């Protein structure tokens, strides 16, 4: 993983008024802290932070926070906030990391391929959206994926089957299911009796299509047809 450089200026003032002045100047307040680092109040460019969040590793990127006084901190994004209406970044937290010490992070997880069981009518259930792992900061993968093509009805994929890069260890138990192909649920009596969306309720005649001839007086209504499952 490449380390991303992010410039910052030291921030002396705090509070809503100071934060508003920062934002008007094109900056947002941020704070950097760690186990061996006292909280450092800084200001950063929201555009620069968006570039970090939009990179391959996103929130898991390793950042070199260069403060104007010559101090440089190796950090990762711990959290960030958006304005509820404008959806613009308004604040960020950074946590200090050391390149020779492992970190615990959540990695985006995805399934690829169409399972055999889905072809025959089953449903793929992906249990996790992210996978917790432990590794050195520069070893953090951008994503984890599994090929589920061979999964049949009732088959599951366990955490023990994950193929992770060297030096990366999942924090899930080996027998933890991360994806499974379930048989389709059978509709109960009430669900079968319930009309489909857009269908006329029982006893109600459907409106004729535009231009269709009206049924002859006294003619029997057409028999209902069940939807094919």
Curated annotation (Swiss-Prot):
- Leader sequence range is none
Keywords (A to Z) from UniProt:
Ribonucleoprotein, Ribosomal protein, RNA-binding, rRNA-binding
Q: Which residues does UniProt call coiled coil?
A: none
- Pfam families, alphabetically? Ribosomal_L25p (PF01386), Ribosomal_TL5_C (PF14693)
Single GO molecular function: 5S rRNA binding
Cite the record's Low complexity compositional bias ranges.
195-222
- The domain of life for this entry's organism is Bacteria
Q: Which GO terms describe its biological process?
A: translation
Chain residue ranges for the region called Disordered: 1-21, 182-229
CDD domains linked: Ribosomal_L25_TL5_CTC
Q: Which GO terms describe its cellular component?
A: cytosolic large ribosomal subunit
Q: Which HAMAP family match?
A: Ribosomal_bL25_CTC
Functional description taken from the UniProt entry = This is one of the proteins that binds to the 5S RNA in the ribosome where it forms part of the central protuberance.
Q: Which family does it belong to?
A: Belongs to the bacterial ribosomal protein bL25 family. CTC subfamily.
Subunit info?
A: Part of the 50S ribosomal subunit; part of the 5S rRNA/L5/L18/L25 subcomplex. Contacts the 5S rRNA. Binds to the 5S rRNA independently of L5 and L18.
For this entry, the protein name equals Large ribosomal subunit protein bL25
Supply the source organism's classification: Bacteria, Pseudomonadati, Myxococcota, Polyangia, Polyangiales
